[in-house]
């Protein structure tokens, strides 16, 4: 790796950088974007991290490619696949024509497998919805009951944090302890600016940075180049035709749990200065998102699960990104800006049939594979180590927990690791 490029002048230069057929720059960008949920990185702040990730990622790619060339391998399994330490494994498998599966948390407490692709592949997920519904052993009546539970128990934000038990008679869903979400308190109240005589539209934007972490699958922005551009253009043009519309932009409550303010929040805050008919609902607000959508005249979303949750509740939903939910028949799927405006300005717009919403709910609860011997301790959160193997708690050994981990955080050892990394750069 002596010829590996380590310094970059711009984000685009880094994202386009490749090692043979491996998009190493994009995978490094994806990992660093996770640090502070940034979609527009200032590379000057991450020079060391960029170099460290590039070196490590290149070593994994070349080493694993060499491993596959010397050993017959049937299948490779790995987690997620978009980060700098996982993507090189996928690149090695593709170069060696070896079958691979990525795995990710499933809604139902199990895990999902993705054959020769990643969890971010929304085309793969969309095709799986109908397959899971069609291949189910349950009657349509029971499938509808299971799919409806996803919405009736507000499980949209509980991904990977429920335990599901289904038998011939009963369906039991238990929400696991979830330290982050359990801190969020909500109230069923509407904002002071909510006027019943107005056309009240609730907008659920998604995190921008996620669109930059798996660029090969982020091909769903067919109408607008960014969410903030879409919001400004839609509100500006709506106001040219009507003074009856009021937009409530609900920033995701989990933003309040991050250690830094999400990068795009400043842009959202400026909307209230630019437009008089906008109310920004902050992440830390106690306004219940479900109560907002239940009272809305219309709901807008890009790729948020809130879109399909509102569709189940028989609300007219307009999806703006060509993502999984956009393709379901329970939501409106405009193809251009004029179609978006016509839907927003239509005072008689009706909700669509929610059968596809039910299929989506069923898919979320039933697509995950439940392990045979592993389950969750319902009284423990992920952060507390919720794993039970054959009913025995899975914990690090005393040596790891009491000696290795504390020592690894000491400054002297950190300096040693930094020195070793420098040697690696020179090799």
State the predicted function of each range.
Residues 98-107, 247, 280, 317:
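Hydrophobic beta-strand scaffold residues
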Residues 85, 111, 284-332:
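A donor-sugar binding/catalytic signature common to diverse glycosyltransferases
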Residues 60-116:
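Conserved nucleotide-sugar donor-interacting segment of glycosyltransferase catalytic cores
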Residues 67-69, 194, 291-295:
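Structural alpha-helical scaffold elements that stabilize or flank donor/cofactor-binding regions
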């Amino acid at each position: 790796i002596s010829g590996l490029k380590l310094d970059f002048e711009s984000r685009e230069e880094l994202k386009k950088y490749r090692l043979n057929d491996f998009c190493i720059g994009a995978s490094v960008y994806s990992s660093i974007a996770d640090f502070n949920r940034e979609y527009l990185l200032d590379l000057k702040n991450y020079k060391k991290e960029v170099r460290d990730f590039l070196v490590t990622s290149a070593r994994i790619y070349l080493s694993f490619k060499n491993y596959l060339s010397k050993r017959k391998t049937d299948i490779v399994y790995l987690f997620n696949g978009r980060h700098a330490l996982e993507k090189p494994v996928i690149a090695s498998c593709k170069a060696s024509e070896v079958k691979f599966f990525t795995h990710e948390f499933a809604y139902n407490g199990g895990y999902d497998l993705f054959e020769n692709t990643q969890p971010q592949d929304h085309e793969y997920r969309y095709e799986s919805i109908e397959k899971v519904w069609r291949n189910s052993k349950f009657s349509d009546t029971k499938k509808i009951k299971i799919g409806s539970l996803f919405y009736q128990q507000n499980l949209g934000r509980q991904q990977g944090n429920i335990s599901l038990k289904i038998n011939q008679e009963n369906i039991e869903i238990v929400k696991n302890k979830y330290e982050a979400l359990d801190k969020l308190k909500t109230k069923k109240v509407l904002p002071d600016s909510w006027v019943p005589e107005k056309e009240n539209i609730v907008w659920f934007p998604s995190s921008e940075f996620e669109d930059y972490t798996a660029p090969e699958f982020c091909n769903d922005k067919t109408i607008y180049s960014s969410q903030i551009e879409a919001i400004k253009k839609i509100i500006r043009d709506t106001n040219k035709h009507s003074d009856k519309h009021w937009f409530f932009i609900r920033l995701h409550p989990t933003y309040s749990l991050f250690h830094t303010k999400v990068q795009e929040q400043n842009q959202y805050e400026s909307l209230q200065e630019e437009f008089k008919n906008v109310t920004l609902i902050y992440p830390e607000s106690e306004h219940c998102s479900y109560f907002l959508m239940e009272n809305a005249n219309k709901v807008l979303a890009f790729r948020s699960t809130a879109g399909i949750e509102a569709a189940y509740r028989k609300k007219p939903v307009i999806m703006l990104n060509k993502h999984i939910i956009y393709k379901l028949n329970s939501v409106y799927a405009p193809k251009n800006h004029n179609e978006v405006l016509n839907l927003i300005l239509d005072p008689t717009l009706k909700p669509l049939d929610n059968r596809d919403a039910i299929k989506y709910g069923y898919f979320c609860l039933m697509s995950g594979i439940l392990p045979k011997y592993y389950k969750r301790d319902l009284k423990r959160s992920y952060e507390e180590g919720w794993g039970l193997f054959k009913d025995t708690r899975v914990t690090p050994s005393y040596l790891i927990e009491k000696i290795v981990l504390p020592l690894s955080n000491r400054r002297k050892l950190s300096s040693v690791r930094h020195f070793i990394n420098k040697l690696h750069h020179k090799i």
